[in-house]
């Protein structure tokens, strides 16, 4: 039996960490803007009889922080692996962003709509803004990959 050297992987974590850091800022800003400018007022208008609809308190912010962290990590990892596999063309980038958006936000909002917890107007506002958010996020990952 002979012992052979195992070659070290040439994968660099720095571009992925840069993309994750930038997306932590971008996605959090986008989520906060979309929520405060559109979703929260629309939810309160649509469901005035529900107490505590779209509340603003510490437990909500803590859950939102967990949501944003999972969202950023998922988007960055899925985008990185997909761009590595399918290429970094603009077409691939937009398609990957659209796929991640459909997997997260379309399912979320359709579920809320199906349970009568969202109106068509909320969907028609939140979904396009979320699509822009995720396509930009995937472009950030692409930029970081190509920069390496």
Predicted feature descriptions by range:
Residues 1-148:
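Juxtamembrane/disordered regions of integral membrane proteins
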């Amino acid at each position: 039996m002979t012992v052979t050297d195992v070659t070290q992987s040439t994968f660099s974590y720095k571009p992925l960490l840069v993309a994750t850091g930038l997306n932590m800022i971008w996605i959090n800003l986008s989520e906060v803007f979309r929520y405060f400018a559109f979703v929260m007022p629309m939810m309160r208008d649509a469901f005035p009889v529900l107490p505590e609809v779209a509340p603003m308190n510490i437990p909500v912010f803590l859950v939102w922080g967990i949501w944003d962290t999972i969202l950023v990590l998922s988007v960055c990892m899925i985008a990185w692996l997909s761009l590595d596999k399918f290429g970094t063309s603009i077409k691939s980038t937009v398609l990957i962003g659209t796929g991640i958006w459909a997997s997260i936000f379309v399912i979320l909002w359709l579920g809320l709509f199906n349970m009568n917890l969202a109106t068509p107007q909320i969907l028609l506002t939140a979904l396009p803004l979320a699509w822009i958010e995720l396509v930009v996020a995937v472009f950030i990952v692409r930029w970081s990959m190509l920069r390496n």
